[in-house]
Amino acid sequence: MAWVVLSLVFTLWPMLDLSVSAWFYRAAGRPGWHGFAADQFAAVAVIHEAVPWFGRSASLLGLLLAVFWRLRPGPVNLRWWRRSLMLSLLMVLGTGVVVNAILKENWGRPRPVDVQTFGGAGTFEPALHPSNQCDSNCSFVSGHAATGFTLLAVGLLGAPATRRRWLLWGLAAGLATGALRIAQGGHFLSDVLFSGLVIWLCGAALRAGYLYLRARRHRRLRLPQSEEG
């Protein structure tokens, strides 16, 4: 449903992307600074460089913690094992593979800074129109925002209240990071919103896969008892 809504919005009103990005842009020749607003602040550049490293560190840390909780002496802390495992898997498969390796490398959408409206040479492409104007690391979807959205993974296998809480944390982190990228001219609004949807769908798939494997394992463990009875 969310995919349909976003698709309709950005298909019917594709210029919404340009309008939002224009809030953060000042053309050359006007008084004061020109370009995208966030580029005027060194702290934003630091955050931009730090987010990918945070994602890589989180995926590695999640994997190490998942192994630790399994191998340490004593009973397994299943809650933290599941949280660590889901965080690592969603960061690698969702952000790393689906977002960065598949979509960003093949969709070809130019970034705001690359289109004529904002001083570039390219032509604006609506979100759901694959293009050939970008060869690699393209605009659709936002990898930085995806890293923030991936925080929802921590609650994927928890109780409903836990899932909602971590979903809110993931939304907050993803939207905040995405807003900075829009203000830098690195992404359009649709890149950020579709990034969140892609990560949510990947998370839902991981949750469904885990629950399916757990249910199948439980059935196998009960099978000998049912045959004996």
Role assignments for model-derived ranges:
Residues 1-63, 104-111, 123:
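N-terminal transmembrane-helix/juxtamembrane module of multi-pass inner/ER membrane proteins
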Residues 65-106, 167:
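Interfacial segments of alpha-helical transmembrane regions
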Residues 12-13, 64-76, 155-162, 205-210:
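Structural signal for the C-terminal ends of transmembrane alpha-helices
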Residues 124-229:
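Membrane-embedded catalytic cores of phosphoryl/pyrophosphoryl-handling enzymes
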Residues 106-133:
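Membrane-interface interhelical connector segments
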Residues 19, 49-57, 83-86, 164-172, ...:
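Alpha-helical transmembrane segments of integral membrane proteins
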Residues 6-11, 92-97, 172-182:
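Aromatic-anchored segments of alpha-helical transmembrane domains
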Residues 26-36, 62-79, 112, 211-223:
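Membrane interface segments of multi-pass transport proteins and intramembrane proteases
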